[in-house]
């Protein structure tokens, strides 16, 4: 990935994403960056490295001593979205059928959730479910379901970072 000066688009720092995959520990020479989002908690980018399954927390406060924290998630990371508090970043590992959850305040993974076939790599949607409280929902490419994941570890700890419902044809 490249960190650039915003107004001029001048490259300031180029960082390789080459590395080992999280599951088989095979070397991948050209993994792609699938998403880059800005943290609401720290001067930090959250970078999804697709083929390796690693999420990089890139502290850009000192480019001369760049600090990168590596979190192991699941291969085939794609895009994702924030919970309603903008603390937790939920991101799809679409061909691994998982959703990874990053706590951007504490800078760690808090969940790697098994979901139904091919979660859609999108931003998702946040709303308050009448039974499960705050949830984040995402569709799928491999089926017609919308998966709901509980996102309130303080108020609804028993549902946090779990699939609480799947909405599909049976609910229509």
Predicted regions span which residues?
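Predominantly soluble domains enriched in secretory-pathway, periplasmic, or organellar proteins
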Residues: 1-171
């Amino acid at each position: 990935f490249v960190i650039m000066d915003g107004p001029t688009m001048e490259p300031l720092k180029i960082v390789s994403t080459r590395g080992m995959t999280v599951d088989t520990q095979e070397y991948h020479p050209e993994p792609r960056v699938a998403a880059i989002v800005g943290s609401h908690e720290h001067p930090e980018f959250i970078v999804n490295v697709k083929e390796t399954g690693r999420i990089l927390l890139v502290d850009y406060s000192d480019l001369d001593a760049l600090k990168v924290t590596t979190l192991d998630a699941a291969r085939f990371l794609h895009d994702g979205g924030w919970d309603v508090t903008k603390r937790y970043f939920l991101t799809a590992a679409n061909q691994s059928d998982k959703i990874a959850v990053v706590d951007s305040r504490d800078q760690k993974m808090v969940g790697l959730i098994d979901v139904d076939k091919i979660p859609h790599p999108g931003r998702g949607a946040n709303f308050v479910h009448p039974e499960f409280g705050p949830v984040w929902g995402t569709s799928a490419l491999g089926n017609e379901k919308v998966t709901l994941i509980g996102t309130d570890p303080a108020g609804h700890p028993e549902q946090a970072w779990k699939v609480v419902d799947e909405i599909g044809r049976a609910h229509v």
